[in-house]
Swiss-Prot record:
The keyword Membrane does not apply. Its cofactor is Mg(2+). It catalyses: (R)-4'-phosphopantetheine + ATP + H(+) = 3'-dephospho-CoA + diphosphate. Its EC number is 2.7.7.3. This is Phosphopantetheine adenylyltransferase.
Length: 175
């Protein structure tokens, strides 16, 4: 029986931390479905199509990975895909309480689906999509935190949408 897990998230954008969890998860599972959550109540930087495109591109060399989208309950999606596990990455203790509550609710909704937590590698422990977007917005260097393709797309999106705010010159003016 193939061991399939669902790795769900918004992936807005995908980070090197996400890819770290995915690669390490493949040591535990035969196949991982990276499932992009479609939440109409949330505002995203990238469209679903853009997120699918980025994920497909950055995972093309990672075997046994499938990119998909879902809405609704994650455990229902897992059952539909015949997956028996949900893979979750945790950066810090602060993630644990929320993730633990989600895991308990998912377990209550479907006892056949287990949640597996992986700690993010130390190199990525501070990395989140939100922090990366905020840094990029103000001209911060995000090189190495996201794949190069994603870095270019963030830069372009920030400039094309007017979200980019150039750093201010901190030199005192004479006068």
């Amino acid at each position: 029986m193939e061991r399939t897990a669902i790795y769900a998230g918004s992936f807005d954008p995908v980070t090197n931390g996400h890819l770290d969890i995915l690669k390490r998860g493949l040591k535990l599972f035969d196949r991982i479905i990276v499932a992009i959550l479609i939440n109409p109540n949330k505002q995203y930087l990238f469209s679903v199509e853009e997120r699918i495109s980025m994920l497909e591109e950055v995972t093309k060399e990672i075997p046994n990975t499938e990119i998909d989208t879902f809405s609704g309950l994650l455990v229902d999606y897992a059952e539909q895909k015949q997956a028996h596990a949900i893979l979750r990455g945790m950066r810090a203790v602060s993630d644990f309480e929320y993730e633990f509550q989600l895991a308990l609710m998912n377990r209550r909704l479907n006892r056949e689906v287990q949640t597996v937590f992986l700690m993010t590698g130390l190199r990525w422990i501070f990395t989140s999509s939100s922090i990366i977007k905020e840094a990029a917005r103000f001209g911060g260097n995000i090189h190495g935190m996201v794949p190069e393709l994603v870095e270019r797309r963030i830069d372009k999106k920030m400039k094309d949408t007017g979200l980019y705010i150039p750093p201010k010159n901190n030199k005192k003016q004479k006068g």
